[in-house]
């Protein structure tokens, strides 16, 4: 009858004949041995157990002192083989999380995410007829929480169209026309878009700061219209897509328009100015969208004209119109979608995908968009204050609750919404992300970071569901986030980005936990 050692079931012999390494033991001969089957199992268990007892203290020290370069230099070889051969989670359950975070796989993944040359994207799926659901056919019911993987990819793609608009403007603020480097080579730009402010500044301001003249220009480039012209991509998406991308606030006059928060009535064929239930929108946003001058038509006229041309050009094809924007661009996107649905003959399905957008109009404006079949999906960061203005309600959830309670006859909130010039309402469906869910960003990130478009795309790429942690296999590179929001990235990763190559070679399989700082 065999006598088994305690915990012998943990260790399994890999072969029946083997030669020990240079570390000798009185229990283990240094020459190959042939033993009888009856004694073979016990001897192999003893060998494995003796190896573990001899090296266990070293392995514990290695785990507890993962940042000690001197210790790793002397013990790296033996420790690496031990970590690879033992089930540490079973021997020391409390070390499971630490071992997972220290794995070479995680370190290599972080190296890839921080690399300047690495820009990995999630693989695209064939959408086919599913594109209508992703475009809001059912108001994204069942697709937001948890977030559908195809919708996640689409949102990141739309955000990158807006980033291209930002880059095209800031690379040459005074240039016209300008080149737009699209993130998707299957699309081509068909029209540049310009917005004109109705605010006038004194001419002497240009003389004081001639190098910043672009900041005070009456008319500025705000985005573009692009259309997919790649047959293969059209087949993948299930239709030919027209994209309208609009950047956020950049010039002094655009900022001044942002601070005109009173509601104004939208143009109608036979307006009734005394009707308190008329659709109304923010004065400044409406001004930028509808104002033109002798040098350039209004953004509204330019956009409606181009979309009408494209719809006629591709008549008979399956089409869709996607309007996307960030910040000010998100606000103008709603006005543009409403205008297209109203004025473009035979308009295809229109959907808005916005990031960090403010409130734009009253409840009647939201109802008007819904009645026209315009679908709106707003991506909102819980810490972004821009999404909570303008308006008299600081908490949008309480706003909706108060509104429902105020629909009774003589309800106070109903009266406030109809008669107060600051009674704003959000539009459409909402995907809410949270800065605190990111393992890379500081939970107390500043206001600018909470509103930053790259931070939004980072959060969307890592979002699984409201009750789930950040996606472990997120593909989006952290390089741009580091470049633009370094002060808001956890110190661990700003340091790692500077010392990445050296750290990778020196530290081998060691990586601290993402949540440790």
Curated annotation (Swiss-Prot):
Keywords for this protein: Chloroplast, Hydrolase, Isopeptide bond, Lipid degradation, Lipid metabolism, Plastid, Transit peptide, Ubl conjugation
Annotated transit peptide: 1-36
Phenotype caused by lack of the gene: No visible phenotype under standard growth phenotype.
Biological-process GO terms, alphabetical: lipid catabolic process
Active site residues of this protein: 327 (acyl-ester intermediate), 384 (charge relay system), 451 (charge relay system)
Molecular-function annotations in GO: galactolipase activity; phospholipase A1 activity; triacylglycerol lipase activity
GO terms under cellular component: chloroplast
Cross-link Glycyl lysine isopeptide (Lys-Gly) (interchain with G-Cter in ubiquitin) residue location(s): 43
Pfam families in UniProt: Lipase_3 (PF01764)
InterPro entries attached to this UniProt entry: AB_hydrolase_fold (IPR029058), Fungal_lipase-type (IPR002921)
Induction line: Not induced by wounding.
PROSITE patterns xrefs: LIPASE_SER
Gene3D superfamilies: alpha/beta hydrolase
Positions of transmembrane segments: none
Tissue: Ubiquitous. Highest expression in flowers and seedlings.
Main location: plastid
Family statement: Belongs to the AB hydrolase superfamily. Lipase family.
Purpose: Acylhydrolase that catalyzes the hydrolysis of phosphatidylcholine at the sn-1 position. Has a strong galactolipase activity toward digalactosyldiacylglycerol (DGDG). Hydrolyzes triacylglycerol (TAG), but has a low activity toward phosphatidylcholine (PC) and monogalactosyldiacylglycerol (MGDG).
Listed name of the protein: Phospholipase A1-Ibeta2, chloroplastic
Provenance organism: Arabidopsis thaliana (Mouse-ear cress)
């Amino acid at each position: 009858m065999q006598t088994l050692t305690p915990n012998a079931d943990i260790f399994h012999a890999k072969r029946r004949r083997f030669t020990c390494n240079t570390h000798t033991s009185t229990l283990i001969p240094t020459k190959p041995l042939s033993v009888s089957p009856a004694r073979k199992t016990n001897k192999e268990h003893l060998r494995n157990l003796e190896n573990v007892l001899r090296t266990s203290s070293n392995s514990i020290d290695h785990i507890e002192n993962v940042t000690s370069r001197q210790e790793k230099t002397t013990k790296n070889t033996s420790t690496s083989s031990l970590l690879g051969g033992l089930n540490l989670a079973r021997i020391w359950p409390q070390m499971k999380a630490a071992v997972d975070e220290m794995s070479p796989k995680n370190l290599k993944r972080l190296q890839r995410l921080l690399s300047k040359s690495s820009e990995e994207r999630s693989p695209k799926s064939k959408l086919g007829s599913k594109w209508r659901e992703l475009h809001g056919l059912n108001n994204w019911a069942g697709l937001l929480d948890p977030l559908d993987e195809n919708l996640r990819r689409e949102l990141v793609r739309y955000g990158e169209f807006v980033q291209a608009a930002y880059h095209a403007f800031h690379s040459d603020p005074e240039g016209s026309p300008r080149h737009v480097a699209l993130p998707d080579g299957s699309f081509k730009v068909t029209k540049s878009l310009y917005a004109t402010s109705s605010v006038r500044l004194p001419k002497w301001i240009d003389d004081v700061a001639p190098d910043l003249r672009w900041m005070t220009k009456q008319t500025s480039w705000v985005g573009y219209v692009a259309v997919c012209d790649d047959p293969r991509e059209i087949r993948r998406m299930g239709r030919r897509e027209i994209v309208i991308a609009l950047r956020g606030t950049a010039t002094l006059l655009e900022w001044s328009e942002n601070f005109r928060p009173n509601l104004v009535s939208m143009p109608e064929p036979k307006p009734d100015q005394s009707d308190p239930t008329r659709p109304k929108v923010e004065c400044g946003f409406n001004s930028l969208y509808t104002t033109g001058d002798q040098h350039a038509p209004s953004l509204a006229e330019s956009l409606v004209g181009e979309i009408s041309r494209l719809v006629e050009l591709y008549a008979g094809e399956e089409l869709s119109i996607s309007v996307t924007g960030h910040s000010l661009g998100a606000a103008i996107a709603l006005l543009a979608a409403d205008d297209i649905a109203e004025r473009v003959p035979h308009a295809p399905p229109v959907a808005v995908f916005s990031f960090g957008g403010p409130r734009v109009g009253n409840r009647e404006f939201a109802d008007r968009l819904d009645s026209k079949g315009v679908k709106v999906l707003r991506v909102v960061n819980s810490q972004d204050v821009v999404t909570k203005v303008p308006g008299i309600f600081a908490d949008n959830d309480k706003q909706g609750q108060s509104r429902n309670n105020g629909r009774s006859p003589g309800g106070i909130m109903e009266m406030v919404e109809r008669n107060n010039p600051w009674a704003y309402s959000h539009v459409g469906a909402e995907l809410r992300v949270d800065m605190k869910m990111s393992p890379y960003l500081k939970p107390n990130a500043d206001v600018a970071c909470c509103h930053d478009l790259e931070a939004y795309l980072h959060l969307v790429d890592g979002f699984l569901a409201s009750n789930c942690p950040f996606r472990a296999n997120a593909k989006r590179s952290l390089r741009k986030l580091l470049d633009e929001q370094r002060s808001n990235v956890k110190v661990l990763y700003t340091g790692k980005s500077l010392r990445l190559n050296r750290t990778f070679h020196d530290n081998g399989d060691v990586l601290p936990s993402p949540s440790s700082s």
